Amino acid sequence: MDTQPYYKTIIEQIDKHTAYRQECLNLIASENVCSPAVVNILSSDLANRYSVGRPRTRWFPGLQHYDQVEEIAEKLSQKLFHVEYANVQAPTGMVANMAAYLAVLKPNDLVLALRVKHGGHYSHVAENIFKSFNIRVEDLPFDEESYSVDVER
């Protein structure tokens, strides 16, 4: 299947929409307009990096430049808002996961989860926010040789 005509049409429609929006006065508060500088930053590779953790203590390698950007943004935020501490990290999968968990779980419920090193998500671990809600978390038994959940245990 040749997707090029579809791609071309999609790009044309995006360009037309962009031109149209530049001629409008948008009075919908939730539809904020980003400056070209912000659009440039958000379309950079940094926007697609999985940056779990804090600067210099990330769970994944290769984020040294990301760390510097985050540290600068936090210092600017501290100065702008006259505060001693600022966290500029966007809500991520953890926020979505916790919203889902808290919608269906009750105190003392049990969650079985994979550890991060076995492919689980960092929001599934016992050391996380679950403690605040008295939700128990246990590791799924994992066979490191076959790299699979050990259903026999």
List PLM regions with ranges.
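N-terminal "arm"/small-domain region of PLP-dependent enzymes with the aminotransferase-like
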Residues: 1-57
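Active-site nucleophile and cofactor-binding loops and adjacent substrate-binding regions
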Residues: 31, 87-94, 115
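Buried hydrophobic packing segments
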Residues: 38, 77, 96-104
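Conserved N-terminal alpha-helix of the aminotransferase class I/II PLP-enzyme fold
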Residues: 50-92
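Short glycine/serine/threonine-rich phosphate/pyrophosphate-binding segments
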Residues: 94-99, 119-124
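PLP-dependent aminotransferase-class I/II
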Residues: 123-153
